Amino acid sequence: MAEAKVVFLHGLHQRIVEAIISFNPAGFTTLVVDGKTAEAPQLEAVKDADFIMVFRARLSDQVLRAATQARLVQLLSAGYDSINLKLLRELNIPCANNGGANSRAVADHAVLAMLSLYRRVIAADRAVKDGRWAAAIDGMNSFEMADKVVGVLGFGNIGQKVARRVQAFDASVQYYDKYPLSPERERALNVRRVSLEELFRTSDIVSCHAPLTADTHHIVNAQRLALMKPTALIINTCRGPVVDEAALVEALQQKRIAGAGIDVFEQEPVDPGNPLLTLDNVVLSPHSAGTTWDTWFRRADFAYKNMRRVWDGQPPQAVATDYDL
């Protein structure tokens, strides 16, 4: 019986690549291709590929069209905004994300940002190292999570894990999602769905966990930021363009909201002139929320099992369905 051919297009360290392809199952062969190379090697590699596995490599339309035998594009990421889903639909090739494999890491990071802002961890660290001891903490500028309302924008795998984590700190959770949970599921998670406007108006923290689509582009805009409490925080660990960055900078500069935890930016790597870099009421990280050593094993395990499902004639799991990008 013929082996299934997987082409792995990536922009990763070799040690990570080796960890991922160690999950290659019997009956599969994986061809590793540097996703940062010229297009020609990619075109040659995919022409007889059964599966294309991708991380940190942008698939051009030409490469997708060349993959005439492909049964699935399998992403190792949660987001799918870098893939032309409309073209894949025309080509009848499904695209799957990582099935929540990095959801724990992203949820951890989102809560880390909340706590860092509330407890002024970065300012306190800097003060102690500078010999100013407790200069950053005056007894009036640090806060607890308990009894706060956390509004989760986008309530999929990551959003639901954020809910569980903040509830452990005795915060309550409300959410907005295009696709509401069943009443039974809401009761089980102890959450309630609210309108977008209510989410921004009544939350102490708004944490963004939506995919980037036409609907969610700049869903956090000047009008919605204006609804927020002056004591509120906004956290973004999903995709930069979900937040109108210029509007956010203005709200932060004018102290119309208290702070922001930002892992993703409209331009990445971030422009050295980005005003966010100059503000002391923000905590920033380099799109690293989902990138832990632990996640690679879950990503790889899910990806190869999903490709195996398709090879065995079953439908793939975690298929992206938003084609309005």
Identify the role of each PLM range.
Residues 91-93, 99-149, 164, 183, ...:
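Phosphate-binding beta-alpha-beta segment of Rossmann-like dinucleotide-binding domains, i.e.
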Residues 55, 76-77, 94-104, 196-197, ...:
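Short beta->alpha connector loops at strand-helix junctions that form conserved
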Residues 159-160:
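N-terminal Rossmann-fold NAD(P) dinucleotide-binding loop
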Residues 2-96, 221:
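An N-terminal-biased, well-structured beta-alpha scaffold segment characteristic
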Residues 95, 222, 231, 237-325:
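Rossmann-like dinucleotide-binding domain for NAD(H)/NADP(H)
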Residues 155-156:
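Glycine-rich Rossmann-fold phosphate-binding loop(s) that bind the pyrophosphate
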Residues 63, 178-275:
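Rossmann-like adenosine-cofactor binding region
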Residues 174:
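Conserved beta-strand positions in the Rossmann-like core of class I SAM-dependent methyltransferases
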